[in-house]
Amino acid sequence: MKFSKLASKLGSETITCSLEKINHLDPDIQGVAAIDEAKPGTLSYIEGAKFANYLKTTNASALILPMDETLQKLAGERGIGWLSSKEPRLLFAQAIALFYRPFQPTPEIHATSIVHPTAKVGKNVYLGAHVVVEAGVKIGDNVCIYPNVVIYPNVEIGENTILNANCSIHERSQIGKGCVIHSGAVIGGEGFGFVPTPEGWFKMEQSGKVILEDGVEVGGNTTIDRPAVGETRIGKNTKLDNLVQIGHGCKIGKNCALAAQVGLAGGVKLGDNVILAGQVGVANQAKIGDRAIATAQAGVHNDVAAGEIVSSSPAVPNKIYLKASAIYKRLPEIYQFVKQMKRKL
């Protein structure tokens, strides 16, 4: 594909393109690659000026650049085709989609799969080897279910959803349209509900359900527990990384992103567009407002206001954390100073 044709297929955020100025920079693009691994005939991208050194050495034939005239000039001097955007990473993601097509199996119900007579399976559905579909399950059109998936009774799965191999969807769970569940995930397993008694722990039955709204993606070995009563809900287009634990009764808003090893205790509520970085822990019943961010390994014990950024454990506003970190580095120096002052008293 000519670079000019590729550029025309990318998003509206493209502002400047070398093809408008230097017509001979219209290489053939045969694929995409990381900037440090790119070969002639590939497209790559640079997200910011701090990666300028890669531009000096890359073998890419074309680049997606930020709105930076210095980078544009350097690319032109090296004979590299380029286009600039306010969102270079987004455009590169779009470019990948032009070259990469995920594996799409031919619709069929494998001979070794087991489908209960009361289950309803839509059109153009793929059920791989050893899939188990229990009583009362409803599967929409164009759903793809890979081998060894187990779907418990009365589950509903929306159209165009993908369940990867070896995941489990427990009873009464509702999976929306266009969701992706990766291998090893457990959706709707029992929440951690036990009541202490003098004789030991009394098990509280978990009669609720899990609801994933449309466009939710759940990473490998992530678990989303159902509650004793009511529902655990994951909002539209929210993305969960691998190894995330969502406790019983949590309510997560739309367009949230939770990185690996995040853990939410029971009853946590997240607003829309919340970001939790790796290994963030959120305590029981805590509320986090819209657009809030918790940085890596934050321990959130209290509510977080909308738009706030918190860090550390226990979590504090990020500005306070940064100041405290600067002081922490100077503690040996401060200690020596205090020690000397005490001698003078």
Swiss-Prot record:
It holds the Pfam family LpxD. Its EC number is 2.3.1.191. One of its GO terms (cellular component) is carboxysome. GO terms for molecular function: N-acyltransferase activity; structural constituent of carboxysome shell. The keyword Chloroplast does not apply. The keyword Cytoplasm does not apply. CDD domains: LbH_LpxD (cd03352). Pathway: Bacterial outer membrane biogenesis; LPS lipid A biosynthesis. Keywords: Acyltransferase, Lipid A biosynthesis, Lipid biosynthesis, Lipid metabolism, Repeat, Transferase. The active site is at 248 (proton acceptor). It catalyses: a UDP-3-O-[(3R)-3-hydroxyacyl]-alpha-D-glucosamine + a (3R)-hydroxyacyl-[ACP] = a UDP-2-N,3-O-bis[(3R)-3-hydroxyacyl]-alpha-D-glucosamine + holo-[ACP] + H(+). PANTHER family: UDP-3-O-ACYLGLUCOSAMINE N-ACYLTRANSFERASE, UDP-3-O-ACYLGLUCOSAMINE N-ACYLTRANSFERASE 1, MITOCHONDRIAL-RELATED. HAMAP family: LpxD (MF_00523). Homotrimer. Catalyzes the N-acylation of UDP-3-O-acylglucosamine using 3-hydroxyacyl-ACP as the acyl donor. Is involved in the biosynthesis of lipid A, a phosphorylated glycolipid that anchors the lipopolysaccharide to the outer membrane of the cell. This is UDP-3-O-acylglucosamine N-acyltransferase. It comes from Trichodesmium erythraeum (strain IMS101).
